[in-house]
């Protein structure tokens, strides 16, 4: 048994040894965290330029040399002089400023990520000569300048400077045999693509040059890119035929060539791309037929060739693509019947065949595409009625059948109401037989957000079943022959923010409920329609009497468009509540009374059209407070007084006020002075006034005769233009 004193002595020795071990371990750890002095100076210069103390970098004091534990800094193994910095990962840290030249002092750096910041200025050339650098990502900043054409980065594997403002010819990574990803997307590079881009980089798999200004033909040297899996060249000025070498890249999975000027026929060699998953050839000048090679593209999930000059029938092999999810051939010249076998296309979710020349009926088999959510057959020559099989669409949310020759609107709505997920429906420019909107028998459409049935010559009144569409955000039933009054319940649809009832025969007064629309009053979430990729949303571009034109967009401005009806009564002062409203169009009605000064409360208003009514009184000066007002039209009323000249009113034209003889001042006739004249001046003015009246009478007579002749000519021309344009007055793209 060990004596008590011996045990304590042994314990003390062991405790001392353990304490010594801890001290040595701490010293070793501290030494392991110490930077090489050269790297430390480079980091301190970098940190001082970009204020990196906020990230936890210790820039002074006894711990300032321990840079290897700073956030985003990676060091290599210990050396005699300390650890060397090999990685700097500061992506998405809200860094502001320019990249200092001192950063190039990190000569052992292998990885540099400064992406998604607010960096400006040029990239130090020395930084692009670091011979060990394998990964560099400067994407999504505001960097600019010219990148040297020949970079010396022998170890580089990933080079990403996308989404900046670089210019000049694209850099060439000569001698970079390990390069796998090269991304220049969304800059201002220009010139031809170098023919030898893959000569020394045979391992390159990802090449992204989209959204620049590259021009010329695709080089045949692309055949050296044998390992390429992704080729992104969209939105440039490239042209010519596609080289055969492009279709020798059998590893290709993604091919994006949209938004260029490529032309010619599509090669049958496309069948060689047996691994391709996505192809986008949209917005080019390709012509001829689509080769019937889809049977060889078993992995293809998305094929888009919209806005070209392609023609002929749909290739039969399209129906062999069980993997296909998206087919977009919009805006070409395809013809014949739509002959797709949906039973063999179980994954198809988006089918866009709009703006072609397809004819015949809608095929009954379409609902067999059980995952179809978006269907656009608009602007073709399709005929007949909506198939009863459409009741079986269980996933369909977006449907556009605009601009065809369908009949029986009642049947169409009664069938489509059974589509449980239908959210957006466009039936414009169909049903031209003067059919009546169905009054009842409609119980569905409970998820409907957007309903457009414009320019269909529909008769009757606004149907009451629309009141049940409680999720409705956009309603456009303009350019029909609807009559009766505007229902009060329209103002009770909580989500409705875009209402177009223009160019009908509606009568009565404006319902007060329109001034209480919840989506347009203060305190509500900004109104919008949820966007679906590849579905054509439409917004009114102008509402001239020559017809309506629509642009394809993803959202609508909050609007009340009630022009070209027979509405009477006064403009409601309560419109001041609609502080979210952007467009108020009450033109071409029979409204009377004054323009309410309260309209100045519509603080978001951009367009106010009150022309061609019977309004009286003065233009309220308070309207000059509408700072976003870009269009104001009160022509052809009975307004009097001085036209305001402040604010946005200084930007309006004379034509916006014409047809109001009582208006004076800015953009109109001068207002008469109210100050009395002295007696002597008054007598002289009486004589002068008589002489001027005689001269004015003669001049007015001559002007009147000339104006009358010109007016008759203009009316004749305008009438012919109106007749010509009314037949196709609503245009969708």
Briefly describe each language-model feature range.
Residues 1-733:
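Plant-biased, solvent-exposed loop and capping regions
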């Amino acid at each position: 048994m060990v004596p008590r004193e011996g045990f304590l002595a042994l314990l003390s020795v062991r405790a001392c040894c353990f304490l010594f071990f801890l001290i040595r371990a701490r010293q070793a750890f501290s030494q392991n965290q110490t930077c090489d002095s050269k790297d430390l100076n480079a980091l301190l210069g970098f940190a001082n330029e970009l204020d990196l103390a906020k990230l936890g970098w210790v820039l002074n004091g006894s711990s300032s040399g321990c840079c290897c534990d700073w956030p985003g800094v990676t060091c290599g193994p210990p050396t005699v002089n300390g650890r060397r910095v090999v990685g700097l990962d500061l992506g998405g840290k809200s860094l502001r400023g320019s990249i200092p030249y001192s950063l190039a002092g990190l000569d052992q750096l292998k990885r540099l990520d400064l992406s998604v910041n607010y960096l400006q200025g040029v990239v130090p050339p020395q930084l692009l000569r670091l011979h060990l650098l394998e990964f560099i990502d400067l994407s999504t900043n505001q960097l600019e300048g010219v990148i040297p054409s020949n970079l010396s980065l022998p170890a580089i594997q990933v080079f990403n400077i996308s989404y900046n403002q670089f210019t000049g010819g694209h850099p060439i990574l000569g001698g970079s045999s390990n390069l796998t990803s090269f991304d220049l997307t969304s800059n201002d590079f220009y010139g031809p693509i170098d023919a030898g881009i893959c000569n020394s980089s045979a391992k390159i798999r990802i090449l992204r040059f989209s959204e620049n200004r590259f021009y010329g033909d695709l080089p045949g040297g692309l055949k050296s890119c044998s390992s390429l899996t992704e080729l992104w060249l969209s939105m440039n000025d490239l042209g010519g035929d596609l080289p055969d070498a492009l279709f020798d890249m059998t590893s290709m999975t993604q091919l994006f060539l949209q938004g260029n000027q490529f032309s010619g026929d599509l090669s049958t060699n496309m069948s060689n791309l047996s691994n391709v998953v996505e192809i986008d050839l949209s917005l080019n000048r390709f012509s001829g037929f689509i080769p019937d090679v889809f049977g060889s593209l078993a992995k293809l999930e998305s094929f888009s060739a919209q806005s070209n000059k392609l023609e002929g029938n749909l290739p039969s092999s399209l129906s062999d693509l069980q993997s296909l999810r998206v087919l977009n051939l919009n805006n070409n010249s395809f013809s014949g019947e739509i002959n797709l076998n949906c039973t063999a296309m179980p994954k198809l979710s988006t089918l866009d065949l709009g703006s072609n020349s397809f004819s015949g009926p809608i095929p009954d088999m379409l609902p067999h595409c059980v995952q179809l959510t978006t269907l656009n057959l608009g602007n073709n020559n399709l005929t007949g009625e909506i198939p009863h099989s459409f009741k079986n669409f269980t996933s369909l949310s977006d449907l556009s059948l605009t601009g065809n020759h369908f009949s029986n609107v009642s049947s169409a709505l009664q069938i489509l109401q059974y589509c449980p997920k239908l959210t957006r429906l466009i039936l414009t420019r169909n049903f031209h037989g003067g059919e009546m909107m169905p009054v009842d028998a409609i119980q569905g459409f409970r998820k409907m957000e957007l309903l457009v049935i414009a320019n269909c010559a529909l008769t009757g009144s606004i149907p009451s079943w629309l009141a049940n569409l409680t999720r409705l955000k956009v309603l456009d039933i303009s350019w029909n022959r609807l009559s009766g009054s505007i229902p009060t319940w329209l103002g009770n649809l909580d989500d409705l923010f875009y209402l177009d009832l223009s160019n009908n025969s509606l009568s009565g007064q404006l319902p007060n409920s329109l001034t209480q629309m919840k989506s347009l009053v203060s305190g509500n979430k900004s109104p919008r329609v949820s966007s679906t990729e590849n579905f054509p949303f439409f917004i009114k571009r102008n509402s001239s009497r020559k017809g309506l034109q629509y642009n394809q967009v993803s959202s609508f401005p909050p609007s009340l468009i009630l022009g070209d009806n027979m509405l009477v009564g006064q403009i409601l002062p309560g419109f001041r509540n609609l502080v979210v409203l952007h467009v108020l169009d009450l033109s071409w009605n029979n409204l009377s009374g004054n323009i309410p000064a309260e309209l100045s409360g519509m603080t978001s208003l951009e367009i106010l059209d009150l022309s061609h009514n019977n309004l009286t009184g003065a233009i309220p000066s308070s309207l000059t407070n509408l700072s976003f007002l870009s269009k104001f039209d009160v022509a052809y009323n009975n307004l009097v007084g001085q036209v305001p000249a402040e604010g946005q009113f200084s930007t309006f034209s004379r034509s916006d006020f014409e047809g109001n003889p009582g208006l004076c001042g800015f953009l109109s006739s001068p207002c008469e002075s109210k100050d009395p004249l002295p007696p002597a001046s008054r007598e002289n003015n009486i004589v002068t006034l008589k002489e001027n009246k005689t001269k004015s009478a003669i001049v007015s007579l001559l002007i009147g005769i000339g104006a009358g002749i010109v007016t008759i000519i203009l009316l004749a021309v305008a009438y012919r233009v109106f007749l010509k344009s009314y037949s196709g007055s609503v245009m969708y793209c």
